[in-house]
Amino acid sequence: MRRPPPLGPTTASGPEGNVRNLRKRQAPGPGAAGGCGPEAGGRGENRQKRRMVARATPGRGEVKSDKSVAASGAGKAARRRVEGRRGQVSPSDRRGLEAAKEAEFPLQTERHTKEKRKVTEASSDDPQPGFDLVRKESLTSSESFQTVECLRSLGKEGIVEGIKRRIRNKKLKSLENPPLKITENEATQNIKVEFQDELYKNTLKYSCNILSPEVENNFVFKLRDCNCFPHSKDCNDENNLPYEPDGGCMHVAENFSKKENFRSLAEKSDTNNIPQLLQTEENVMGVNKLLPEESDLYQSKINGLLPCLQREKNKYSIEESSVGRKPRKRMKLSEKADETVTQMNFSNEYNKSELMLQENQMIADGKEAEAKSPLNVLRKVSHNTVSLMDHLLSVPEMVEKETSSEHHVNAVFQKTIEPLLKEETENASEPLGYENMALKEDFKSKSCIGKSPEYHIERRSSREDLRSDSEELKLSCQRTIPMTGKRTWPYYSCARISAWCWKKASLPESSYFLPGSQKSCKKVDVPKHQTNKTHLTDSKLLLQSSLTETNTESSSKEKLDSNLNCLFSVSAVEHTLMVIKEPIIKDDKKIKSEELSRSGSEVISNTTEDTQLTSDTQSLTGNKKRDRGNLTKLNLTAASKDGQEANNSTGKTIHRKACVAKQTFVVPDLVKILNTGRLTNFKIPLLKNKTKKRKEVNAKSSEREGYSPLELLDNLSGADTRQNRSKENVSMTMLGPQTLSIQNSVTPVQASSDSFYNKNSCSISPSFTKHGNSSKPSNHFSEPGNIVSNKEVASLTVENNAFSCDPGYVEKSPSFCCNKQETFRPVSSEVRGRKITKNFSEVGFPDILKAYEDDVLLIDVIQDDPDLFGVSNEGELSFTSEVPRISQEPNVPGEHQSTDSKYVETPVKKEPSDDLRELPVLDCGPIKPDICASNSAASEIKHDPKDANTSLGEVANETSENETLGDFSEQIKGSDLDEKHRFTDKVITKEEKENIYEVRKSKDSRNADIMVGECQFAAPVPKPLCLLVPPLNLSGHQEDTILNTWMNDFRFLGKHSVLKLQNPETCEIFKREKNVGVFQKSLGLMIPYKYCKFHFNTLRGCERPLCKFAHVPEQGDEKVCMDVFKKYININELCLLQRAVNVFMEYYRKFPPGIYFDLQVLNDLLNSLLKHCLLKEVFQIVNLSIMVKMLPSLKILLNIFEHVATMKLRNAVPALIDIFCKLVEAGMVLDPEHFNYIVKLLYQVQASKQEITAVLEMKSRLQMRQFKKNWKCDLDSALNKLEHCKEKGDWTKLGKLYINVKMGCEKFADFQTFCACIAETLTKNCEDERPDTPFCEFAETVSKDPQNSKVDKGVLGRIGISAMYFYHKLLQWSKGRKVLDKLYELKIHFASLKGLIGPEKLASRCQIVNVAAEIFLKSGSLDGALWVMRESEWIIDTPLWPCDRLDVLNRHNLLCTIAHETLAKSLYRQTFEVLQNLPGFQNSQETVEVSQYSLLFNKLLGSCIESNSLGMSSSVAEFMISKSIPIDFSFLRRLITSLGRSRLWLKARAHYKSALSLGCYPPLEGNLYRKLLLIPSYLSEIEMLLAIEIFMVSNASSIQSPGTSTQILQIVLKRCEDNQSRSNDDYQAAVERLIMAARISDPKLFVKHMTVNVNKEQVYSLEHCSALKWLKENMKWAGKVWLFSNH
């Protein structure tokens, strides 16, 4: 394989060059390099294929993201080559690697500066703790950078021209987009800028030419093979690729130097995708060579850590046997390296962590004997982490944003952590110390800060690399041993090891810091190592805080610190994201960081980090199991070991898990986005072709990753987003405002990560569960937080890396769990899942069921085993102790099922499930969740059927809850404290226990796999599946662990699994049902198919959020309800009784009781509820039973009162009294002693007086009702008594008889008959001699009844009408008057009633009123007659009350009679009222002629005028004029004169005007306008004045116009023709009246006598001045009155 000329160490200046020399001298050992074993050849072929593919697809390199992807792919290819040559690395390769590393540092620096420019969010002032010394020097030395750049560019010349064109295009693009901001020191920034410029130029020139096709192929292969791919992406150095063959070293370099290079070269990698990747590989190789000692030390440390972890595993897990050899090898290596590690603590530690990660990747890829080695496992984990990083990096913008934010966070974190790092360095193991030193140096040097942008760039590239690595990891995460033909998985296998646990841990924390961490990740290409350190520091801080919480601060801190060192090394892969996120997250800040991590950038970085941690954690799990005392420390160490060497600190792992959880929220989205595009190619190959498929997948993944993250986002956002649902993508996008690229990529990544996450969570969960159970489930569950941390950690890790979660490890560290609890937030482990999903989708999957069929390891667990269910090290109740079946029993296959069902019923679990809604896992359906589920299921089974089951169900659920990580502590508390919602020991029935126990004992691995798979499948389902487990009492961490289960078992193969689900949702439901069937024991009910058998026929019920089967019986299936109630009552479990209440309420609210309704079942149900103190449910059922008229027994009512009295439930008394009253009203019969007993109980409860009075009132009413029922309404006997009363004339007794009959008669018809008999008795055969009126006595007796009602009044009124008619007929006016008076007294409105018997029964209302009025008139009561008329509203004939003409005539005569009587009494108003209501005035339809009433009205008018009742006279006149009733003009004139004299001028003028219209006065004709007024001499002065006013107003214009003063207004006092016989005295009086009229006027008018005309009529003139003055003062009103008509 041709590789470009080595750059040589001279390119680097200062300590950088020295470090490189050291690396050269220290040739990577077989552990560092990592032998590929049998797969080496295959990988080589794959690399060649990949080269060909990369050549064929130059378009991918056109995008920056593609470049980064290509770079990562190249890095992977190089690593693969190196791994293939493990132990066969040639000196030239080493030199190439060394040169590549040397060149990589400056490139990274330059890239870092460029990245800083682009990412304004990242601040140069923020210290980057993860930077290496070499990196710092490279940053400070601009010349060395340039030299390295040139060398790299020379190395790039070997690339194919096609690649060159792509690189050039990319380069141009990158050049077009210069860095936006340089945050580092000016000097460093300038150097970086210059270096970048040179790099760009060189890249343009040499990028395509330097690299040979062979190198290109290697690049592609390396992308598949190693996690370096992300780094190579960042570096995009062609030189790195040729030196990539040293996979182990490269991988370490990748983590360390590549990170730097990635940062500095991220942009270059965009322009020079493949060449830069090659350079990255070379740089990595170079770095490995330069730091061979460090790498060796690192590997040895890792080896030491691994053995320790393995020893722990041997103690606590059964898996140790399969991995025993590997731990031993690692122990040897670690022992050898421990001595050197002390010296090289800082750099070596970091390198070692990277080496371990690389080795883990190599192991995953090779899956051979070497793969079995712990170092290989760690390396594999690192690879996986890098792959995740590659994925993250594939989205450049996202990465940049994430990097910037992360960088900032790192700075803050460094500041805060620096003292802690110091302490940790002292307390921690050498690896930890090394990392702490690195962190310190990073904090101290500003150049490190300058490198932080590089670190961010590196992170971008590492993300892309992570993509390719994740694909490889998918292969590598597959069983390491299966490659050898064995079915069992080693401890270090991702499937067995919950490598994802650390991922979860870091994910939560990093999630909190996601925005910043993403940015920092981008910056951390070189600072990745630093970032890892920082992460370790963060983890350390988190661990410390958690230790403080767990009261094991001192000891745990030291252990955690040491462990944290390992974690930090591992976190090197994870980068600053986790570290930064963790420090920020810590406790309260962690939540915020989680939210930030959700933005997507942190998620990405967390995913990478988490993956590494997971791998280490897995390897550590076994050792943790060995020593409980060391469990916490070992677990922490395992976590750190997964991240770095897995030896240092479980506490770190915890922190990382928290960070991972945080990151997971965002990362799943990004992963989902990135993975979405590859989901279509997601296939699961058979195990047999595992190696080949891996290679193919690696080649494909490298090609795929060749695309830039942006391209992936663009291409995948459409299809993947559509497939994986834009919901999660949207959420991730919202979280990712920090970086646009992250936001964009988040959508596809989320989609893909959802499906993958679901799958991964299942697979990881098993491994985690297994380890956790073996190690110490009690620790895992020791605290709600601890328990959660174990499982959640795994699940979180799954989200980020799907390979780096170690459930066992997580469980081992209770302190870690505590920290993790704090750390865990709604971190989207699904983000990790998403990223992993993308990688997995690129890789094929083997036949899961077959693969795991023989590999399943069933562990017989004692339910009361203190190790599994005991108290945590912290001394707190283990989470499992409160919810053993939920957390730990789920660890068993049966437990998983129980967990699955439990989560639904557990409200706390449901709360996490709410968060799960956001998890991509829910959206995993389109991603072939069946495959993921099956893989995860198999993995879980392998790890430990118990743990696997728990992790399967719980992982999915916990993963969902991880979304709710922020609330996981509360959820845990709720689960621990809320017995109702949690399936506590009390709630869990014996049947459940037996089921769980049976499941644990189950040795059928196939069944276990199926169950796990089903659970996993359920998890992928968008809503129901994911929610299946989360509702369990599992804490947020446990939920994360569940997600990790997916990752653990998940295989990174691009092919679909053999189990292809046509409908993922259906398959998931089916499998879930199958699982439930296995785990839950049927209650023995025969439930129709259409109803959910889990809801009705299991103790825990249905856990599906959305169940396609009915949970409430339909109409007609009442028998099913009764059967269910009977069964639930017999079992007498609280949960079942509550479910029975729900079913009862839901069914009988919709449907009435039918023939199958059993009242005894209702009573039994109420009794059972009372026994369980479910008083609220009792009230609900009783109220509903009253509504449906199915009353419970009296005994139940008394029992309720007794319960309330016994429990002193004073607040329940009002509701109970209300129910009691309803029951009595509904027909419940109580004896007096029952009432007395109830009152006694109420006194015991200190009920209020009103409440007791209410009971007593109900007693009286009940007695009356009982009397009614006891009274036999014998009509004959009643009638006999009635006759007896009639004979004796005892009308009072008759009234009592009426009351009794009324109370006892059940038929209203009989009652009416009896009333009619009473009416006849009261009206007939009444002797005239007797003055009394029977009706009055009878009515008096009835009215005295206290229960007298309107009905009684109506009956009395009708009987009174009959009596009235009787007396009217007999002309017995006095008796009739008495009847009417009694009705009036009783306020009975008989006018609207009819009689009971005789003609009055059909009489009209008018007739009844006429009869009554006539009786009053005949009896001399005019007021009575008027009262009757008024009560009847003077109604005569209306449509509602029709009557015949005879009734109308009778009314007319009656009213006229009344009018005469009133008028005779001078009752003018009453008379006028009567006349107004004569027939013909009320209804226009009446045909009565009203003119016939003229005499009556004129008589009334005359009477009024005579009596000087001017008001009434005026009203009568107006009414007559309005109704056109002829009016007597004499009366009208008299009225006008009287009004005028009374100074009532308005009415006088109105009537005068009306009189003119009626012709009362001669017409004025045209004289008015001729200035001549003719006034009859018979007019009164008032009438004359009114005539003069009209005259003046009519001539007002003439009078008021100037020049008309000479005009004369003449008034002629006209003699009447009929007045000729009159004497002259009358005429002379008229003259005087005229003069008086002029004087009456206001102002006065002056009339002058002018002459006498021929007719001897006096002619007068109206003085002009007086008329003008009058008009001025009165013209306004006069004009309106006289000029305008009123009508």
Curated annotation (Swiss-Prot):
It holds the Pfam family Asp_Glu_race_2. The keyword Cell inner membrane does not apply. Residues 1-131, 319-339, 596-632, 880-916 are annotated as: Disordered. Its main location: cytoplasm. Residues 31-41 have a biased composition (Gly residues). Keywords: Cytoplasm, Differentiation, Spermatogenesis. GO terms for biological process: cell differentiation; spermatocyte division. One of its GO terms (cellular component) is cytosol. InterPro entries: TOPAZ1, TOPAZ1_dom. The keyword Cytoplasm applies. This is Protein TOPAZ1. Residues 80-113, 897-916 have a biased composition (Basic and acidic residues). Residues 598-622 have a biased composition (Polar residues). Important for normal spermatogenesis and male fertility. Specifically required for progression to the post-meiotic stages of spermatocyte development. Seems to be necessary for normal expression levels of a number of testis-expressed gene transcripts, although its role in this process is unclear. It comes from Macaca fascicularis. It comes from the Eukaryota. The lineage of its organism: Eukaryota, Metazoa, Chordata, Craniata, Vertebrata. It is found in: Cytoplasm, Cytosol.
